[in-house]
Each structure stands twice: as structure tokens, then as C-alpha cells.
């Protein structure tokens, strides 16, 4: 009876399976990009007291807040990238990976152009920090461009993951260097040791991110080689329990059901007045 109940009432109903499948197909990465880009966009717009004014009213007219407008453009691009990912995975009838990759490459191209012009009035430590960031963005652009013609090369995908990790971690490090130094004292542009340590920190980021990726790859490889063979061996043994074709277990269940019906038929005359 226990086996029969397990077969007739499975743990996951078809409705729950369909719901889990729909949740699994949601582009969470795209939603995260949309939410993050939107929040940062609102932050840039609201952080200025006078608002995002494009040009001042005095004569001669000049553009105002050039860096803030560049930040706003970057965050809007991030939001648009998330919208494209979400539409490709959840709105279109069939996912278009080429559209996602092409949009990402175009956005990285624009990001590189914005970064190059972003450092025009920078110097010292700030210029060095942004130069290293531009180097990472440029290498990422090359890898993404190569992926358009070779989308299934695992080496390019690994390099893409590493460079995205580098860009994210170095952006956080740049925030601490330029705006909130850990020591509490601002970095000195005229001190050569500060500029040298910026490069040292960048090399540390390279080693940490590479070790992080290597650890994930090593753990995944270990898990695959240790547990994958056992799954392959136990898979065919469990298959007959879920098959609909008649087998020994199916015949046993029929015999149990028939015996229960006979017992009930014998009990009915005794219980009747």
C-alpha cells in the first residue's frame, strides 16, 4: 500500500512541476540588471541638488555635470541590457542568444568610449586606477567580440567570466581608493609609492579572482568525477519504478489490490444486519 500510494500520489504534482519550470526559466540575471540599473539611475538623478541640468542658462552656455551624465548613460545601458536579456528569455517565443551577445558587445563598446573620455581631467592615482579599469574593459571587449564568431568555445567563456569578475572587483576597489580609503587618509597623487601600490592591488585582484575561478573549477570537476558515475549506475535501476509498462512491481500491486477487494467483499455480509 505504501508503494502504491507513492506511485499514485507523487511528491511533485504536474502543476508544481510546471510552476518550478517557469520559475527556473525566468531571467534572474536580466531582472537584477534592470533593478540595479534603475536604482543607480535614480540615485544619480536625485543626488544633485539642482537636478540633472544639461546646460547652464548663463551666456555663454556650457554643458554641466559631464561625469554625472556619463554615469547616467552607463546605468541606462545596464538597464537596457537587462531588458534585452529578459525579453530574449521570457518574452520572445524562442531565446535569441545572438541578440543577447550582440547587445552586450555594443554596450561594452559604448562603455569603453565613455571610460576613455571619463579620464580626460584625471591625474595621479585616479588616472592610474581608471587606466587599469580601461585595460580590463578593453580585454573583455575583445573576448566578447570573438565570442560572436565562436560562441561555444569554453576558453572564451572562461576568459569572459574572469574579466567580468576583474571588472566588478576592481570597481569596488576603485571606490575605496578614490572616495573612502581604508586608512582614512586620501591617496597622494604626487607620491610614487601610492601609484605603485595601485598596481600592486590590481595584481592581487588578478591572483584572487584567478584562484577563485580555479577553486570553483576544481570543486566542480571533483564533484563530477566522484558522483557522476554513481548517478549513471543508479539511474537505470530506478527507471522501472516510474515506467508505465507492466512489470513485476505492477503485477504485485494488482494482486494486492485484488486481495483488498476480496477482503472487503467478505466483510460486507458480516457487517450487514
From Swiss-Prot:
Pfam families: DUF716. Belongs to the TMEM45 family. It comes from the Eukaryota. PANTHER family: TRANSMEMBRANE EPIDIDYMAL FAMILY MEMBER 3 (PTHR46441), TRANSMEMBRANE EPIDIDYMAL PROTEIN 1 (PTHR46441:SF2). This is Transmembrane epididymal protein 1. It is a multi-pass membrane protein. The keyword Coiled coil does not apply. It comes from Homo sapiens. The lineage of its organism: Eukaryota, Metazoa, Chordata, Craniata, Vertebrata. Its main location: membrane.
